[in-house]
């Protein structure tokens, strides 16, 4: 990791925290406000998702019941661990929830792992192709974390309607937790409760990865003789953080769906 000599410290940080943007109004590489697509986030997340699917597909095709290889062992351990976690939290049909949980955990972990790549490596490669800004950590972008949390929210609503029906869900919203006589308060509490879930889910992941990325950038500004030591210490700690954050996002998704699927 090294800083660009032509930039001040503030400019260096700003440069590495800026996205490769596409203005959806006129399809130019400018800031379009709300109608801006962060191409770097899209590219890295899609590539990592495709890599995840490809690796699992290849190993599934080569899976053997005799003596499994190291990759097969690792994936079987991950699948069993996630399935066991889902089984403890979700007591209905796990045919959709377990694969969803596994996908979320692996995909979020891979996107988080990009935070451990040297901060100048990927931006420099894209600079050679004429791209001035490139932010390589998708989960440090709130647009992606909110997109994922909103998708989880849609699944929660779907399970609410699927398990309780429109009438049953309506009764639950109007009567819980304070009974029928306080219906307006019940509705307000329910709206707040449901609205906070995707917001907290998105901000928790974004905040941790944004802070981690910023610290790596600040370490890159230090003298070369201190970068390695501090970088290694923070990398070891951050490896735990990215794993825990992927697990928390997966776990909360399962819990929210489980709560929605419960019949009262």
UniProtKB/Swiss-Prot annotation:
Coiled coil: none annotated. One of its GO terms (molecular function) is proton-transporting ATP synthase activity, rotational mechanism. GO terms for biological process: proton motive force-driven plasma membrane ATP synthesis. SUPFAM superfamilies: F1F0 ATP synthase subunit A. It is found in: Cell inner membrane. It is a multi-pass membrane protein. The chain crosses the membrane at residues 39-59, 97-117, 139-159, 205-225, 239-259. Its main location: membrane. Key component of the proton channel; it plays a direct role in the translocation of protons across the membrane. This is ATP synthase subunit a.
């Amino acid at each position: 990791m090294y800083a660009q000599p032509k930039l001040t410290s503030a400019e260096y940080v700003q440069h590495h925290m800026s996205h490769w943007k596409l203005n959806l109004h006129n399809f130019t590489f400018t800031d379009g406000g709300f109608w801006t697509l962060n191409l770097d986030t899209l590219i890295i997340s899609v590539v990592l998702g495709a890599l995840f699917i490809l690796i699992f597909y290849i190993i599934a095709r080569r899976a053997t019941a005799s003596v499994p290889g190291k990759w097969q062992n690792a994936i079987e351990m991950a699948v069993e661990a996630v399935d066991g976690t889902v089984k403890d939290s979700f007591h209905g049909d796990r045919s959709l929830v377990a694969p969803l949980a596994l996908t979320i955990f692996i995909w979020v972990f891979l996107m988080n792992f990009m935070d451990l790549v040297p901060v100048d490596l990927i931006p420099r490669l894209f600079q050679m192709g004429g791209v001035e800004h490139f932010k390589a950590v998708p989960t440090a972008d709130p647009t992606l974390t909110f997109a994922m949390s909103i998708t989880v929210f849609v699944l929660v609503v779907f399970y609410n309607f699927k398990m309780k029906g429109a009438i049953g869900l309506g009764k639950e919203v109007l009567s819980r937790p304070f009974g029928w006589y306080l219906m307006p308060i019940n509705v307000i509490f329910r709206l707040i409760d449901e609205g906070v879930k995707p917001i907290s889910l998105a901000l928790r992941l974004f905040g941790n990865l944004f802070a981690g990325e910023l610290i790596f950038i600040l370490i890159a500004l230090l003298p070369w003789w201190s970068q390695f030591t501090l970088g290694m210490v923070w990398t070891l700690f951050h490896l735990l953080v990215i794993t825990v954050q992927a697990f928390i996002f997966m776990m909360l998704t399962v819990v929210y769906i489980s709560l929605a699927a419960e019949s009262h």
